[in-house]
């Protein structure tokens, strides 16, 4: 990648692959994504939480990908509560409880078909933006969005009406895919290094145990 020295273009990143040029497009979230927020099945009926369908809450959006949830619901619960079964690869953000640092700006991408609570919002791309690109964009901007735009007194929340109006800049699909691959390679390197660190910690503990 190279620094972009073209100051005449305003809607371009500061760092860019040299084979790409021209301004990025700009559009609203509402124009680019279908937005959906779920709900909570009644706990009065225990059968509704006795199933195998993932039910994502806002506190579970901690990692890049989410494959499992603490609570699971039944097909009956999904049907009775009109809960959409979101496909693999759906981008999900926390929209309730954003006064908390550990919740504000959190997001994940599903690796299994899942449902969500009303404290989450799912994004389904209509055409031009890949969810992995959106994930990186939200990781950069999500915390500030929560601080500036969440509403409420005791509990700070984001609503559909607020989210759909946010503008997002994005490149062509080819550039998006290259950016996604590049960031994925960095993530893989980080994971490898973290594994090495954990193995060294275990080795150190084993050596100390034998020495002392």
Predicted regions and their residues:
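DNA target-recognition patches
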Residues: 30-33, 43-76
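Conserved loop->alpha-helix
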Residues: 141-143
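Non-catalytic DNA-recognition/assembly elements of restriction-modification systems
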Residues: 14-40, 63, 165
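Extracellular/lumenal glycan-associated surfaces
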Residues: 19, 27, 31, 177-189, ...
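Short, solvent-exposed loop/turn positions at domain surfaces
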Residues: 43, 79-80, 152, 184
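A short glycine-rich beta-alpha junction/loop motif
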Residues: 9-10, 113-121, 151-174
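Short amphipathic coiled-coil heptad-repeat segments
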Residues: 1-22, 192-212
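A short beta-sheet element
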Residues: 57-58, 68-139
């Amino acid at each position: 990648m190279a620094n972009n020295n073209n100051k005449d273009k305003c809607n371009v990143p500061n760092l860019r692959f040299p084979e790409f040029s021209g301004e990025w497009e700009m559009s609203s979230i509402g124009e680019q994504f279908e937005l959906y927020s779920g709900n909570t099945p009644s706990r009065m009926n225990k059968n509704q939480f006795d199933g195998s369908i993932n039910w994502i809450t806002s506190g579970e959006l901690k990692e890049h990908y989410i494959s499992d949830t603490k609570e699971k619901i039944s097909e009956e619960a999904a049907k009775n509560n009109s809960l959409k079964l979101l496909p693999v690869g759906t981008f999900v953000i926390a929209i309730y409880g954003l006064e908390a640092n550990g919740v504000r700006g959190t997001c994940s991408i599903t690796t299994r078909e899942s449902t969500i609570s009303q404290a989450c919002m799912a994004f389904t791309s209509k055409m031009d933006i890949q969810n992995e690109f959106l994930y990186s964009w939200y990781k950069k901007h999500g915390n500030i969005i929560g601080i500036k735009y969440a509403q409420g007194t005791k509990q700070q929340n984001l609503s559909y009406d607020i989210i759909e109006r946010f503008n997002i800049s994005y490149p062509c699909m080819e550039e998006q895919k290259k950016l996604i691959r590049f960031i994925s390679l960095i993530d893989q390197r980080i994971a490898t290094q973290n594994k090495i660190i954990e193995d060294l910690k275990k080795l150190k503990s084993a050596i100390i145990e034998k020495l002392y």
